[in-house]
């Protein structure tokens, strides 16, 4: 189990490209509200890479474990995706970040 407060601090790196929480909008990357249980490439208001759309079309749904695998090595998990992150190598940081995403992703995106 991760620490939500530490995950919020870890998300600061992500916030350059992603928004989460009440009123979140797509930025360089998609907003992350409702990410758990969302099909990869599944936000109709975001222009995903073909690689991400293909992953979703093949059935990839974001679970905590799938997010962990992706965030640890985005280009390995989904070659050709647009995410600039090289990967998060520390298991504790991944735990905290995923705890924060689960906690915060229940918010609704901006209308």
Swiss-Prot record:
UniProt xrefs under PROSITE patterns: CYTC
Short name of one Pfam family: Cytochrom_C
Sequence positions that bind heme c: 14, 17-18, 83
Post-translational modification: Binds 1 heme c group covalently per subunit.
Keyword flag S-adenosyl-L-methionine: no
Role noted for this protein: Cytochrome c2 is found mainly in purple, non-sulfur, photosynthetic bacteria where it functions as the electron donor to the oxidized bacteriochlorophyll in the photophosphorylation pathway. However, it may also have a role in the respiratory chain and is found in some non-photosynthetic bacteria.
Family the UniProt entry places it in: Belongs to the cytochrome c family.
Name of the protein in its database record: Cytochrome c2
Source organism per UniProt: Agrobacterium tumefaciens (strain II Chrys)
């Amino acid at each position: 189990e991760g620490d939500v407060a530490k995950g919020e601090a870890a998300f600061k790196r992500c916030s350059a490209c992603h928004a989460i929480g009440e009123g979140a909008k797509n930025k360089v990357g998609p907003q992350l509200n409702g990410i758990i249980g969302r099909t990869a490439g599944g936000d109709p208001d975001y222009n995903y890479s073909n690689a991400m759309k293909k992953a979703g079309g093949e059935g990839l749904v974001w679970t905590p474990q799938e997010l962990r695998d992706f965030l640890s090595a985005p280009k390995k998990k989904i070659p050709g995706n647009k995410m600039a992150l090289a990967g998060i190598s520390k298991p504790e940081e991944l735990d905290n970040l995923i705890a924060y995403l689960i906690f915060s992703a229940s918010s609704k995106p901006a209308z």
